[in-house]
Amino acid sequence: MLDSKLLRTELDETAAKLARRGFTLDVENLRLLEEKRKSLQMMTEDLQAQRNARSKSIGQAKAQGNHEEAEKILAEVANLGSDLDDAKKALSELLDELQSITMMVPNLPDDSVPAGNDEDENVEISRWGEPKAYDFEVKDHVDLGEMAGGLDFASAVKISGSRFIVMKGQFARLHRAIAQFMLDLHTEEHGYTEMYVPYLVNADSLFGTGQLPKFGEDLFHTKPATEEGVGMSLIPTAEVPVTNMVRDTITDEADLPLKMTAHTPCFRSEAGSYGRDTRGLIRMHQFDKVELVQITKPEDSMAALEELTGHAEKVLQLLELPYRKVILCTGDMGFGAAKTYDLEVWVPAQNTYREISSCSNMQDFQARRMQARFRRKGEKKPELVHTLNGSGLAVGRTMVAIMENGQQADGRIEIPVVLRKYMQGATHIG
């Protein structure tokens, strides 16, 4: 959530920055609402002051034995009280309206983010590794998995529907090995604390990280949002429960940065992805991911973004998977992000790079929603932290890349060296 002061004192400048990411802020409506807010605020304060003064006069009149005057003033106070209640109600309703508008406004892009409308205008930063040249016809991961009997899409459709998977035998083990390797790397070498978190979260948590109210249709809910009562939602990413660890807390400066990682399933309705990536493991309703989260001081967050992205890159490098790093343009960034890097892994059967990790600096956007703060040494007033998150990595897509990049002419799949200790020493599957 943006600082409301920006919408009051720097409205035109804020609108211009939002326009860079394709968001049109209704400046005239906000300006009108702000004038109403000021007027109602002044009216409320004036009525409160009048009532306080009258109440004091009642006591003075009674002390002087002038009960008739006291009764007269008491009647005036009653009328003022009614007017004050009306003014407070009108102000509260107006503040709610302003809040509902603010909740739908995305984060401001950092000045270093390139301008652009969509993914076609993202800017490539670097590449690592060279795609292999194959002397046989390349198969995709679906064919490779079904040939070996390790990926069973038909059973998943029977059990649940489309965009689900059943894995068997060595393929299920490889999936587990990938996640275990990532967790070990991030906790043992990159300094993250492993977390086990709930997979069902409440609305406050989803509001805190920005999924609600704007993206409710992308979630799986335990009860429709229209029903009374508090429902729960399946997490779309571990970013939600892990980042919410600092909601409504004040962290000591000395304890920052906080670095946390979690391996969880993620659940997404893919409401806006009809017809996209309908084959295979690329876009699923349920998929596993190892998430990286950092909580930092404001002045440290941009350096932390570089570090966090580097941690995700290290996974790909150790798995010897060719990838490229891109910075997202203003029009392609997520709702809460100020700056985002995507890592895209080479997928041979598609002859292209596909996103496997998205690493973002949210700055204080989530922290303001969550009231996540820290206190500097020697200071009384706490400040908002900055929050960062990234995939380290998406397990299913990593498996796709391993299968397709490691495929052999006979249909077997070479296991990356760093995973073999998790696979009982096996060098190939399939």
Swiss-Prot record:
Major location (coarse): cytoplasm
Record SUPFAM superfamilies: Class II aaRS and biotin synthetases, tRNA-binding arm
CDD domains tied to this protein: SerRS_core
Region (Disordered): 46-67
Keyword presence, Cell cycle: no
GO cellular component: cytoplasm
E.C. designation(s): 6.1.1.11
Residues annotated for L-serine binding in this entry: 237-239, 291, 391
Function text: Catalyzes the attachment of serine to tRNA(Ser). Is also able to aminoacylate tRNA(Sec) with serine, to form the misacylated tRNA L-seryl-tRNA(Sec), which will be further converted into selenocysteinyl-tRNA(Sec).
Domain notes: Consists of two distinct domains, a catalytic core and a N-terminal extension that is involved in tRNA binding.
Protein name: Serine--tRNA ligase
Organism the protein comes from: Photobacterium profundum (strain SS9)
